[in-house]
């Protein structure tokens, strides 16, 4: 499932608006994840997952900035995400199903913050992009 040129353009265009708010967007998406799917908190037992915490801001920023790196390398996601793929497969061992849950909460957060820009075509492009990212991140799981 490869992104079309128009889907790539939609991902990159929205990323330019997300980038200045990466930590806040990421923190909000993680907070939505933990509230909607409390079982996902098990991977973050060492974090303060309360609203506005520094842990949510820091990790949310890492997550969203990793997506930014992926958006800059849409033609070679495998190489761009190789280190993260190794980390998730061999160290963190995150349940692959959680990537779909996080994808959903990221999209909800984007829809809230970018109501005008996050139209149906952009949402479809981001859904496909996040699915491709999840596929790469879980590609080394056995």
From Swiss-Prot:
Protease recorded as keyword: no
InterPro entries tied to this protein: Globin, Globin-like_sf, Globin/Proto, Hemoglobin_a-typ, Hemoglobin_oxygen_transport, Hemoglobin_pi
GO cellular component: hemoglobin complex
Family according to the record: Belongs to the globin family.
GO molecular function (one): heme binding
Tissue: Red blood cells.
Taxonomy of the source species: Eukaryota, Metazoa, Chordata, Craniata, Vertebrata
Domain Globin: 2-142
Entry keywords, A to Z: Heme, Iron, Metal-binding, Oxygen transport, Transport
Record note on quaternary structure: Heterotetramer of two alpha chains and two beta chains.
Species, as recorded: Xenopus tropicalis
Pfam families: Globin (PF00042)
Gene3D superfamilies, per the entry: Globins (1.10.490.10)
SUPFAM superfamilies, alphabetized: Globin-like (SSF46458)
Binding-site residues, heme b: 59, 88
Protein name: Hemoglobin subunit alpha-3
Domain of life: Eukaryota
Its biological purpose: This is a larval (tadpole) alpha-globin.
Keyword Coiled coil in annotation: no
């Amino acid at each position: 499932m490869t992104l079309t040129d128009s889907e790539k353009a939609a991902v990159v265009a929205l990323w330019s608006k997300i980038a200045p708010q990466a930590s806040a967007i990421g923190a909000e998406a993680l907070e939505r994840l933990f509230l909607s799917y409390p079982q996902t908190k098990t991977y973050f037992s060492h974090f303060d997952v309360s609203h506005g915490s520094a842990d949510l801001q820091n990790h949310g920023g890492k997550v969203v900035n990793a997506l930014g790196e992926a958006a800059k390398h849409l033609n070679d996601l495998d190489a761009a995400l190789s280190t993260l793929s190794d980390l998730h497969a061999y160290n963190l061992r995150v349940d692959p199903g959680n990537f779909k849950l996080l994808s959903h909460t990221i999209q909800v957060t984007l829809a809230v913050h970018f109501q005008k820009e996050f139209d149906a075509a952009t949402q479809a492009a981001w859904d496909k992009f996040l699915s491709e990212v999840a596929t790469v991140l879980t590609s080394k799981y056995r």
